[in-house]
Regions:
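Hydrophobic residues in well-ordered beta-strands that form the structural core
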Residues: 59, 96, 121-123, 147-148, ...
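Rossmann-like dinucleotide-binding domain that binds NAD(P)(H)
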Residues: 155-223, 227-231
């Protein structure tokens, strides 16, 4: 256990919008972290939010960089690269919200800068820190079929990214992490409903293991649904991201009976409700970054999730391109 007398971590948040304020609240909950400042190009907005929490307001992220150990980047996607680059080059460890960058080349460059500066670069795949997902990884074995649904109503504040980058990238990341094999083929369709970008998308991924994954994302559905269902040889597993809940269906017995020329089939099964420790996934993600920062400060090794981050982004970008260009199916070659 680390000594309580360790220096506190100084943190900052770049972006005082909807997502940025979630990060602010998460930092404020951590006893070993001091939230130093909040950045927004709208200085009046930054001041309003900063005053609420008794911290400093900045209009320029480069001013914040000199005062913090870690910083969250929660700005529009097209600004992720320049903001994260500036923070890394000025010595801050960085959590950049997903999607990491608009291009794979920019994402690779950020990781290069992080290595060069000996800084931690963490990408905000928050569902990795969902308690149900962490439990799921322990029980999934040889999946046959994966069915993912992330559906919800349209939010006018999110129009810069397609539904693939806004929502589906979470599920791409989780599915790729669950299958012990390589994707070989992708089929994708999508359409625009409420914005100038794709709002509904359906994707099928075939792996070299034979696993088939169907991923559906929508921001045109009035009910909010966040589920993942997995068929494997010994069980059917259903995860609810929102409830952080897992149900496992297993066959208990089956029998055939014959009565005067008719055959009846009876099958019995049992359902196991897996207890999951529920916590705020974003808070856990930020705690992970703080812990990694302390280990790096102590000279201990910190393993980045670079390959996983790049692979998820690469597939999301390819799916987005397929839908935009009307390409229904491609053979997948990992560009990472």
């Amino acid at each position: 256990m680390r000594a309580i007398s360790e220096p506190r971590i100084r943190a900052g948040v770049v972006g005082a919008g909807h997502m940025g304020q979630y990060h602010i609240l998460a930092f404020m909950e951590l006893w070993d972290v001091d939230l130093v400042g909040i950045v927004d190009t709208d200085l009046a907005k930054a001041r309003q939010v900063a005053d609420t929490y008794g911290v400093r307001a900045f209009a320029d992220h480069r001013e914040l960089a000199e005062s913090v150990d870690v910083a969250t980047v929660a700005v529009p996607t097209e600004l992720h690269f320049p903001v994260a680059r500036d923070l890394l080059e000025r010595g801050a460890h960085v959590l950049v919200e997903k999607p990491m960058t608009p291009t794979l080349e920019e994402a690779k460059e950020l990781f290069r800068i992080a290595r060069l500066r000996n800084r931690i670069l963490h990408v905000g795949h928050v569902e990795r820190f969902n308690g149900a997902v962490q439990e799921l990884r322990k029980i999934v074995e040889r999946p046959i079929l994966i069915e993912s649904r992330r559906l919800g109503p349209f939010a006018p504040r999110v129009q810069d990214d397609s539904v693939v980058m806004d929502l589906m990238i979470h599920d791409i990341d989780i599915v790729l992490g669950l299958v012990d094999g390589e994707p070989r083929k992708i089929a994708a369709v999508g359409s625009s409903v409420n914005s100038g970008r794709c709002d509904v998308a359906n994707v099928q991924v075939l792996f070299d293991t034979g696993t088939m994954a169907t991923i559906t994302a929508s921001r045109a559905t009035e009910e909010k649904i966040r589920t993942l269902a997995i068929t494997q040889p010994d069980a059917y597993i259903v995860l609810d991201y929102t409830e952080q809940d897992i149900h496992i269906y297993k066959r208990a017995a089956q029998e055939y009976t014959m009565n005067r020329g008719s055959i009846r089939y009876r099958r019995a099964s049992f359902v196991e409700h897996l207890k999951v420790h529920r916590d705020n996934p974003l808070k856990l993600e930020i705690q992970h970054l703080i812990g990694a920062t302390r280990r790096r400060r102590a000279g201990e090794p910190v393993m980045p999730a670079q390959q996983d981050d790049l692979r998820s982004l690469a597939m999301a970008l390819e799916i987005e391109r397929m839908i935009r260009d009307g390409v229904p199916e491609v053979a997948w070659r990992d560009p990472c």
